[in-house]
UniProtKB/Swiss-Prot annotation:
The keyword RNA-binding does not apply. Expressed in renal cells (at protein level). Residues 1-32, 104-118 have a biased composition (Acidic residues). Interacts with Crk-associated substrate BCAR1, NPHP4, PTK2B/PYK2 and tensin. Interacts with INVS and NPHP3. Interacts with AHI1 and TNK2. Interacts with NPHP4 in a complex containing NPHP1, NPHP4 and RPGRIP1L/NPHP8. Interacts with IQCB1; the interaction likely requires additional interactors. Interacts with KIF7. Interacts with ANKS3. Interacts with SPATA7. Interacts with FLNA. Belongs to the nephrocystin-1 family. This is Nephrocystin-1. Disulfide bonds: none annotated.
């Protein structure tokens, strides 16, 4: 398995590292013989920051000093020589290629050579095809703009060498094509005359269930040994972002689960904490995973991240603290077993290879098995559990879109949405060729809730309350339940979404989150006391945004997913 491979690699590395002192004299002679050869092959690099030796064998250097790289080790610590002829280990994140002609600016040729050096293999270990899709080049540009800040933080020692700007956050910022609200929409067939993943079942009087190649439940357990950033940055959120990935492309929405963190166990992150009332869906570690991609290299990409603010400048940012790719099928196409997986994290971005999250952990692992075991225990890791589905879960998941990742605690609400979509688009539409605007507030606004988890929680708690008052016979009546759901939605979500009292949703801003939750909680309490939203809607205190037709209108052609061949 992957873990064994990693252990073997570590053993090799540590054997190389073992007995350093005894070998040093022989090495010295060998290096003198090879000096001229190294001179020819090695490149000059310029330091982007000051570095002070952390232990014997490291090379101290100052910013803008020119260093000759003698050997590039895969653990991120390179052997370098300074102008005085002193040699030692340096962290690769502190240097960049030096171009004599242009001073510090590196030539394009050098850059591309560097890219090949770190990027010729993907998370799955396959060769990378040259990325041409425009969103990827935009992401690379955005990440390269952030790299300067991250370099500064790394140089200051504020973050470990393997941290990077978050790749998945950048994709989410690009537009809506990696958001759950996009994947929740139906997709047309290539002919554009029918829906590919939304069909009517006349026998049951609702939408037809659809199997998917990948359909299971995954539980995020915990993250261990995650290195801490320094005190110069304040962490606003710790989270895991996950998506379907084929080693090259993101093939689903990017789902985010926020971790719970306690200062008494600073290197451990946990999920699904015990809370009074309902567990917020943002903290729910139980996720459903659906994908119908036929790629043989299909898997889940996990990226651990932090949202931070720099104390000195007030600048905000998103960092990746490591990533791991779990392939879902073996070489012969058989799905991996449902069990708990202990996944060791990689540093860098998913398009780099051989970068450690924190190289200082394993760079001096000695040869003994005990040392290796200790080193393995100190490696950053993510624990996840793949669950096999019982019949009820399988039936529920098959009512969802073919490709979607989301929180298990919202699944019943997503199914209501899909069933209402089926009623409106398949059962009640006057003509299947009609693409007129449809008046339906639920269809028009529900996808927004997927980008505002606190609003989804408001709907969940209102629905749970309503459901608790229903008789058993009513709960079995699908049409009655749907009608009740529509009532709850109009009472709870519609007024809140357009209230001026509700500040816009902002990720990882504590004051905004608290202010929003107060408005939501007060409104739900009022509804409970008054038996509905009418009083709140008519109250002079409830100020609403000017009415916009989009609150009511479902634009079929505007909302459907574009068929990407």
């Amino acid at each position: 398995g992957e873990e064994e491979d990693e252990e073997e690699e570590e053993e090799e590395e540590s054997e190389e590292g073992g007995g350093e002192e005894e070998e040093s004299e022989e090495e010295e002679e060998e290096k003198q013989e090879n000096e001229s050869h190294h001179q020819a092959t090695s490149k000059e690099y310029i330091a982007v920051g000051d570095f002070t030796a952390q232990q014997a064998g490291d090379l101290t250097f100052k910013k803008r000093e020119i260093l000759l790289i003698i050997e590039k080790k895969p653990d991120g610590w390179w052997i370098a020589k300074n102008a005085k002829g002193n040699k030692g280990l340096i962290p690769r994140t502190y240097v960049e290629p030096y171009n004599k002609e242009e001073g510090q600016d590196t030539s394009e040729e050098e850059d591309s050579e560097e890219d090949v050096e770190v990027g010729d293999q993907t998370a799955g270990g396959e060769e990378v095809k040259q990325r041409t899709d425009s969103h990827w080049s935009a992401v690379q540009k955005a990440i390269s703009e952030q790299i300067n800040t991250v370099d500064v933080l790394t140089t200051m020692g504020a973050i470990p060498a393997g941290f990077r700007p978050s790749t998945l956050f950048q994709l989410l910022e690009e537009g809506n094509q990696f958001r759950a609200s996009y994947f929740l929409q139906p997709e047309l067939t290539p002919s554009q005359l029918a829906f590919r993943d939304l069909m009517w079942d006349a026998k049951t009087g609702t939408i037809r269930s659809r199997p998917s190649r990948v359909s299971f439940i995954l539980t995020l357990w915990s993250c261990k040994m995650i290195p801490l950033p320094g005190t110069s940055i304040q962490v606003l959120s710790r989270h895991v972002r996950l998506c379907i990935f084929d080693g090259n492309k993101v093939l689903s929405n990017i789902h985010t689960v926020r971790a719970t963190w306690q200062s008494k166990k600073p290197k451990t992150w946990t999920f699904s904490p015990q809370v009074t009332g309902i567990l917020p869906c943002l903290l729910d570690g139980d996720c459903f995973i659906r994908s119908n991609s036929s790629s043989p290299d299909l898997g889940i990409l996990f990226e651990l991240g932090i949202s931070y603010i720099r104390n000195s400048t007030g600048e905000r940012g998103e960092l990746s603290c490591g990533w791991v790719f779990l392939k879902l099928f073996d070489a012969s196409g058989i799905p991996i077993p449902a069990k708990t997986y202990e996944l060791f994290l990689n540093g860098g971005t998913p398009y780099e290879k051989g970068v450690e999250v924190d190289p200082s952990v394993s760079r001096r692992a000695y040869g003994s098995v005990f040392h290796q075991m200790m080193t393995m225990r100190r490696q950053p890791q993510l624990l996840v559990k793949l669950r096999s589905l019982n019949r009820r879960s399988r039936d529920l998941l098959s009512l969802l879109p073919e490709t979607l990742i989301g929180s298990m605690c919202t699944i019943h609400l997503l199914i209501f949405y899909r069933q209402i979509l089926g009623d409106v688009l398949l059962k009640d539409r006057t003509s299947m060729q009609s693409a007129d605007l449809i008046s339906n507030p639920v269809l028009a606004t529900f996808p927004k809730l997927l980008e505002q988890p606190d609003m989804m929680d408001a709907l969940r708690s209102s629905w749970a309350e309503k459901e608790s008052t229903l008789k058993r016979s009513e709960k079995r009546d699908k049409e009655f339940l749907k009608a009740m759901f529509l009532l709850v939605y109009h009472d709870c979500v519609v007024p809140l979404l357009h209230s001026t009292l509700l500040p816009p949703f902002r990720w990882a801003e504590e004051e905004t989150e608290a202010a929003r939750w107060k408005v939501i909680a007060d409104f739900l309490k009022q509804n409970q006391e008054n038996g509905g939203a009418l009083q709140a809607l008519l109250s002079p205190d409830g100020v609403h945004e000017p009415f916009d037709i989009s609150e009511q209108t479902y634009d079929l052609l505007g909302e459907i997913r574009k068929n990407v061949a």
